[in-house]
Design a protein with these regions (language model features):
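Pre-P-loop entry segment of helicase/translocase ATPase cores
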Residues: 7, 14-16, 22-163, 236-254, ...
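Pre-Walker A (Motif I) flank of P-loop NTPase domains
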Residues: 166-172, 196
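Conserved RecA-like ASCE P-loop NTPase motor core of nucleic-acid helicases/translocases
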Residues: 178, 183-215, 224-228
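Short, contiguous acidic/charged loop-to-helix segments that flank catalytic cores in large enzymes
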Residues: 17, 148-149, 178, 201
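Conserved P-loop NTPase motor core of helicases/translocases
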Residues: 111-145, 209-442
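Glycine-rich phosphate-binding P-loop
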Residues: 157, 172-181
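Contiguous, well-ordered alpha-helical segments that form the cores/surfaces of helical PPI scaffolds
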Residues: 158-165, 185-190
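Extended hydrophobic/aromatic-rich secondary-structure runs
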Residues: 1-70, 312-374
């Protein structure tokens, strides 16, 4: 290999060199180039070189300068509005927006139509592309790792945070006081920890203020820029905060960071077990109430003592199969098998059920082909008696398993470890960085 302004040639092994050929030219008007997170507005040419799973880029600027970059150095995004289907769908959406009455006056377009008119670029990797051209742009299931929960969580909040990083669009719904703000804070923490930015929007200022105040409470106000109205922007400009000096204390040596990540993973595994047990406990208690209520009504309807002792322990799942089978025979709703093999199979099934009823459940005197009702009542009785005991025993087992965990301590460990890792990421991002002060709202 020879280099410019150097007559000497050099040799390299094949694994040390990437030979890039046959570049693809991209239309600059249909792409956006970001460097260091900032949009490059003076791009005149974009060339893409592919080498295996990697992309290399040559970008030419209006000044004449040409730069070579890898995917990690720049981000080139393409619009989907150059596709016919996308253009037609988006044109339809703009027409629908034009007739929307939101803030629409006789001599003024509606606000929704104004917003649509301002959009001339839709990244083909965004969720919007999946909606306006679903045949080409498929919904993506994303992967995530090492999620942190510095603001605490419960089972549903943990699931919601994970879903936010697995799907392009997530909806978290719940009444006031169910922890939606806490979930949002954990999502924000994970986004910022990954070195990215996040825009938090709402139809009212109080929701945004709530998030901001929670971040201030943990000494994280310096990462927030409250914007929105002109007054809010001007207030932000006049009250800009520098990076606090305590950020220098948030460093975390690599060895300590690895240890904390290991602790975080172990804690999450234990909490997952606790959450699963608590969820099962809640579902079983709900089922217990339903089964007890059904049992009382069943006893009243059939003249059975509610305190009837259980003589034979049998799995309730087996009993309910027998119950439903003979109930359909008693009601005359059992579907007759069609075909020889089906009749043989159904015959063997009926024989197996008769054997179970006669010899395992010992229901000899209840087994009358001409009248199945007594057998059905006996099976129902056995089901309720067995299922009630099964639920009680499982609840006791869950109680004993939960007693081996300290859920409060696990939650505190999760929160503290996550916050330490989050602040360590902020230290790496802001400690040596000069504070940026904006002069006006146009910066």
């Amino acid at each position: 290999i020879c280099f410019k302004n150097n007559p000497k040639s050099y040799t390299y092994s094949a694994d040390k060199v990437v030979w890039l050929t046959n570049p693809q030219w991209l239309v600059p008007e249909l792409c956006k180039v970001y460097r260091g997170g900032r949009l490059q507005t003076d791009v005149t040419e974009i060339w893409q070189f592919e080498a295996g799973q990697n992309n290399y880029w040559r970008i030419k600027y209006r000044s004449g300068y040409e730069g070579e970059y890898t995917d990690g150095q720049i981000n080139v995004v393409k619009t989907c509005l150059d596709e016919e289907t996308s253009m037609n769908t988006y044109a339809y959406l703009k027409q629908v927006a034009a007739i929307n009455p939101l803030r629409k006056e006789e001599d003024k377009e509606g606000i929704l139509s104004q917003i649509y008119e301002k959009v001339d670029f839709i990244d083909d990797k965004t969720a919007a592309a999946c909606y306006i051209n679903p045949d080409k742009h498929k919904v993506r299931i994303l992967s995530h790792k090492d999620l942190i929960y510095p603001f605490g969580c419960n089972a549903s909040q943990k699931k919601a945070v994970a879903a936010a990083f697995e799907h392009q669009v997530s909806v978290v719904q719940g009444p006031p006081g169910t922890g939606k703000t806490q979930t949002i804070l954990n999502v924000i923490a994970n986004i910022v920890r990954n070195g990215e930015t996040v825009l938090v929007v709402s139809n009212n200022n109080s929701a945004i203020t709530n998030v901001q105040e929670k971040l201030e409470k943990y000494g994280l106000a310096f990462i927030v820029a409250p914007l929105g109205s002109k007054e809010n922007k001007e207030l932000f400009i006049s009250q800009q905060t520098l990076v606090p000096t305590e950020v220098s204390l948030w460093s975390c040596p690599m060895q300590d960071g690895m240890r904390m990540k290991s602790t975080l993973h172990d804690t999450l595994r234990s909490l997952d077990k606790v959450y699963a047990l608590l969820n099962e406990d809640a579902m079983l208690r709900q089922e217990q109430q339903s089964v007890d209520l059904e049992w009382r009504h069943f006893c009243m309807d059939n003249g059975i003592d509610e305190h009837t002792p259980l003589e034979r322990r049998v799995q309730s799942s087996l009993i309910i199969r027998l119950w439903l089978h003979y109930q359909s025979k008693a009601d005359g709703t059992l579907i007759a098998p069609d075909g020889l093999w089906s009749r043989i199979t159904e015959g063997l099934k009926s024989l197996w059920m008769r054997i179970i009823c006669r010899y395992r459940l010992r229901l000899h005197n209840k087994f009358e082909q001409s009248d199945m009702k007594p057998l059905v009542i006996e099976l129902q009785t056995l089901y309720y008696l067995n299922r009630r005991i099964e639920i009680e025993e499982r609840l006791e087992t869950i109680r004993q398993e939960l007693s081996t965990y300290d859920a409060d301590l696990l939650t505190k460990t999760l929160t503290d470890t996550s916050m330490t890792l989050f602040k360590a990421s902020l230290h790496g991002r802001y400690d040596k960085r000069e504070s940026i002060l904006f002069k006006d709202t146009k910066d």
